[in-house]
From Swiss-Prot:
This is 3-hydroxyacyl-[acyl-carrier-protein] dehydratase FabZ. The gene is fabZ. Its EC number is 4.2.1.59. It catalyses: a (3R)-hydroxyacyl-[ACP] = a (2E)-enoyl-[ACP] + H2O. PANTHER family: 3-HYDROXYACYL-[ACYL-CARRIER-PROTEIN] DEHYDRATASE.
Length: 146
């Protein structure tokens, strides 16, 4: 298990854009399972939507991507790199996520070679699928000159 502080030592995201509270399971370069406790204090609920707060789907996808990044960046060859989206495939949203929900975030790598990868991702609340699909990503070295 990884705490929020440990996660911040692996991926560069910080509040308010760090969307993982803890990692329950991780196999570097293979898979990760994370948790996001959704509270009414999230900044995005101020405008999405007043009186009917719903977590934006794109932020659920971002939370899934951050979970995948933890697994990818824990590999020795990727330490210090930046995980970035290169594509989103077949993403489906099946349930609204609201304040009080605990979002379980699962990412399983389908392919990962030479810093490029594809992962199957699923977000659930109480065992019910909120979002599922596939994402593509790359691990880039921000210190290299173009």
């Amino acid at each position: 298990m990884l705490t929020n502080v440990e996660i911040q030592n692996i991926i560069p995201h910080k509040y308010p854009f760090l969307l993982i509270d803890k990692i329950l399971e991780v196999e570097p370069g293979k898979r990760a399972v994370g948790i996001k406790n959704v509270t009414i204090n999230e900044p995005f609920f101020q405008g999405h939507f007043p009186g009917n707060p719903i977590m934006p789907g794109v932020l659920i996808v971002e939370a899934l991507a951050q979970t995948a990044c933890v697994a990818g960046l824990m590999l020795e060859e990727n330490k210090g790199k930046l995980g970035v989206f290169t594509g989103i495939e077949s993403m489906k949203f099946r349930r609204q996520v609201v304040p009080g929900d605990t979002l379980r975030l699962e990412a399983e790598f389908l392919a990962f070679k030479l810093g490029m990868g594809k992962a199957k991702v699923v977000a659930t609340v109480d065992g019910e699928v909120a979002a599922e699909g596939q994402i593509k990503f790359a691990m880039i070295d921000t210190n290299k000159k173009a």
